[in-house]
């Protein structure tokens, strides 16, 4: 019993010592704020250069996870709320996008964004699910991803990191480009190449339906 009480006291004191108030008072996490901002921008720029859809989504994941680290490093109440919320919103949105990328490969054997010409009309359900997931990741209202980014931006302003708020806005613009480009190519461009579609397993479509209905 004595050991249990001592352990609880140590945990409680540790949380108090290294909690958000400690980070705010000492500004010991400010370096992590700028490191997260650099990762957000660098990953977004690299994602734009990737023609492989899964590689593009992978670098997008690095960028989005840096949002969470940024919120924790800012350590304000709004930023922490945004970071916590972003864990959920990003998980739902990105799982949907990766499922769609997998479904496109299974049905059409296409991996590259540049090869998606005209596929939006041939795979409407998959592209519809992809669109919902992309809009949530970008943070377009009223999708749930908009709330987490809103709290992160407000948390940055609360900590007087105006430049960080601007970086988050620029990152969202980059998100628009590299996440919506596959949709634009799929519906606005045509290809002379014959693509033989293969029926995807029903489990793939059930998974897609479950993911974007939650988003």
Pin down the residues of each PLM region.
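Re-entrant/interfacial helical elements at transmembrane boundaries that shape
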Residues: 61, 101, 145-155
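Helix-coil boundary and interhelical linker segments in multi-pass alpha-helical membrane proteins
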Residues: 15-28, 68-86, 155-163
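Cytoplasmic/organellar membrane-interface segments at the starts of transmembrane helices
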Residues: 121-126, 172, 180-215
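Internal transmembrane alpha-helices of multipass membrane proteins
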Residues: 4-5, 28-75
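Single conserved hydrophobic/aromatic residue that forms the stacking wall/gate
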Residues: 1-13
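Structural signature of hydrophobic alpha-helical transmembrane segments
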Residues: 24-39, 87-95
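Transmembrane alpha-helix interface/packing and boundary motifs in multi-pass membrane proteins
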Residues: 42-48, 132-142
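Membrane-interfacial loop-to-helix junctions in multi-pass transporters
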Residues: 30-38, 77, 119-129, 158-163, ...
């Amino acid at each position: 019993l004595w050991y249990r009480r001592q352990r609880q006291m140590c945990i409680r004191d540790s949380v108090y010592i290294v909690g958000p108030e400690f980070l705010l008072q000492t500004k010991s996490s400010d370096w992590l704020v700028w490191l997260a901002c650099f990762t957000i921008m660098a990953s977004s720029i690299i994602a734009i250069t990737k023609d492989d859809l899964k590689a593009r989504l992978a670098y997008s994941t690095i960028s989005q996870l840096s949002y969470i680290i940024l919120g924790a490093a800012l350590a304000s109440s709004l930023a922490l709320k945004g970071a916590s919320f972003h864990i959920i919103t990003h998980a739902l949105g990105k799982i949907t996008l990766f499922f769609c990328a997998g479904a496109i490969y299974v049905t059409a054997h296409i991996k590259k964004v540049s090869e998606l010409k005209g596929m939006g009309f041939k795979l409407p359900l998959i592209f519809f699910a992809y669109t919902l997931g992309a809009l949530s990741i970008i943070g377009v209202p009223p999708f749930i991803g908009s709330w987490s980014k809103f709290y992160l931006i407000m948390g940055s302003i609360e900590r007087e990191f105006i430049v960080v708020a601007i970086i988050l806005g620029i990152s969202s613009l980059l998100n628009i480009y590299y996440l919506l480009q596959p949709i634009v190519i799929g519906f606005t461009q045509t290809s002379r190449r014959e693509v033989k579609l293969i029926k995807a397993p029903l489990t793939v479509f059930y998974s897609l339906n479950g993911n974007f209905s939650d988003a």
